[in-house]
Regions:
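C-terminal helical cap/extension that packs against the catalytic core
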Residues: 42-47, 359-415
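Nucleotide phosphate-binding/pyrophosphate-handling subdomain across enzymes
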Residues: 3-4, 16-24, 132, 264-370
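Residue-level detector of alpha-helix initiation sites
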Residues: 12, 75, 113-117, 277, ...
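Beta-strand->loop->alpha-helix junctions that form or flank phosphate-binding loops
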Residues: 56, 92-96, 229-247, 298-302, ...
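Short, basic phosphate-binding NTP loop
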Residues: 1-108, 129, 302, 308-312, ...
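Residue-level signal for inorganic ion chemistry
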Residues: 21, 68, 109, 138, ...
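Short internal beta-strands
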Residues: 27-34, 212-216, 348-349, 368-377
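Phosphate-binding loop of NTP-binding sites
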Residues: 4, 22-23, 61-63, 72-216, ...
Length: 448
């Protein structure tokens, strides 16, 4: 009998899951709360299997459904899924659906910040293995699409957000990584405890021979080591570890099974900042357990230039470097960007306010920024927090165009201009990549 699945959400993940499930022979009802359109080829595939695209009242569809697959943008708790659970219908995330159709190896990577850089780096290292590899999840296309043509010998690097992890059930990566945990997405999870619990789902179904890689420098994450059913490998930027991956005199060092391995020195990297050192440590640990050789890790690291919108160098204008850190959608990410510079920063911040605490960030802004330029919905709250922290020069503007123009007029060497918003982008842009590209285009158009 054909299985009927309702896929809730018609974005990249939802459409990817719908396509994959239909190709597996399922009858797929792709559902959206609002009127929407999808690719004609996908719509025809769904109709061929007896499904289709449905908008509006999803409750009328539940009588036909055996399972609901949620896109990351749909909260686990909502009226439709609450009703489905009462009816005994299984509700899972798109990541869980992808996992159930895949039989290869997985490195799952989560954390508040650094996921995309670490996952990208892991993906590059995995490419050196003599087996098929892929990267997916919260990066690129849906995980369901990435695993379609991968066999049991493949390795997959999966970037996983808390949204994706809150709906997993049996998901079990061979290697699980938790990079860090700071306040974010509290508008959805409401408490840090709920946010952390979603992150912990990445290792809950692991077995004793699996590996979980945890940040030793984060007290909360360190405490999670006792909860893991798998082997724990720590990474640390500050401590020399008897067992794990750490910095030893600036050298990235692996200590495991009474053996020491040196990968490379941090000064040889082409990315900078303490946060990137943590990303590299986690990537090295992940790929060590996937069988990547030390020499191949070293070669990839020496060539790696980072990821777009993550502390990305744009260009130098009149002696002033401009950096695009549009991916900084929370204060902790902006703190990491500020820490990467010695000072003399003209900081562009603001956007859609997630209502996270600003005090630690503004304390660092006061110490490192010459000028703070604020825009977006958050600018009034950010202004109050900056003034309370003693930030001297605070400017408010209405648009990104005005922000870049003002920064250009004020900036002079040895200053740097840094876009690191500490906010999501939805008040002014479709997403953070759109915000970053717009910023880069404005910088490119400045008089030289």
């Amino acid at each position: 009998m054909t299985k009927t699945v309702l896929v809730y959400g018609s974005g990249i993940s939802g459409c990817g899951a719908a396509d994959a499930l239909a190709k597996q022979g399922c009858r797929v009802l792709l559902y959206s709360d609002k009127e929407t359109k999808i690719d004609n080829a996908l719509l025809e595939l769904l109709k061929k299997q007896g499904g289709g695209l449905y908008c509006g009242n999803g409750e009328t569809l539940l009588q036909e459904v055996e399972q609901i697959v949620l896109s990351p943008g749909i909260p686990l708790a909502n009226p439709l899924t609450d009703m489905a659970v009462q009816m005994g219908i299984e509700v899972i995330s798109e990541v869980e659906a992808a996992y159930r159709s895949y039989h290869g190896h997985i490195i799952g990577i989560t954390g508040t910040n650094g996921k995309t850089t670490t996952t990208t780096l892991v993906g590059e290292m995995l490419k050196t293995l003599p087996v098929p590899t892929a990267v997916g999840g919260n990066i690129g296309q849906a995980l369901s699409k990435e695993v379609e043509n991968l066999g049991a010998d493949a390795w997959l690097a999966a970037e996983l957000s808390s949204f994706q992890l809150e709906g997993v059930r049996e998901f079990r990566p061979d290697v699980a990584v938790i990079l860090n945990l700071t306040p974010d997405h509290l508008d959805r999870h409401h408490t840090m405890e709920a946010y952390g619990a979603a992150k912990c789902n990445i290792f809950k179904k692991q077995r004793e021979n699996d590996i979980v890689i945890l940040n030793y420098d984060d007290p909360i994450i360190r405490s999670w080591g006792e909860l893991a059913p798998s082997r724990v490998c720590w990474f640390s930027r500050r401590e020399q570890l008897n067992r794990g991956v750490y910095l030893n005199g600036g050298n990235f060092t692996i200590a495991w099974d009474r053996q020491l391995y040196t990968v490379c020195h941090k000064k040889d990297l082409r990315v900078f900042g303490g946060h990137n050192e943590e990303n590299v440590l986690a990537a090295i640990a992940s790929c060590f357990f996937a069988g990547v050789t030390i020499e191949n890790m070293r070669r990839v690291l020496l060539d790696f230039t980072g990821v777009e919108h993550r502390l990305e160098y744009v260009m130098t204008v009149n002696g002033v470097p401009y950096y695009n850190d549009s991916k900084a959608t929370n204060p902790d990410s902006t703190i990491k960007a500020l820490e990467a510079f010695d000072g003399h920063i003209i900081l562009l911040a603001g956007g859609h306010d997630k209502m996270t605490s600003l005090e630690p960030m503004m304390k660092l802004v006061q110490a490192k920024a010459d000028v703070l330029i604020l825009l977006g919905e958050a600018k009034e709250r950010f202004y109050e927090a900056a003034a309370a922290a003693g930030v001297g020069d605070i400017r408010k503007v209405e648009t990104m165009d005005e922000a870049v123009e003002l920064a250009y007029k004020l900036a002079a060497a040895p200053q740097v201009v840094l876009l690191s918003p500490a906010c999501s982008s939805y008040d002014m842009f479709e997403n953070f990549p759109a915000r970053g590209r717009y910023f880069k285009n404005l910088v490119a158009a400045l008089p030289k």
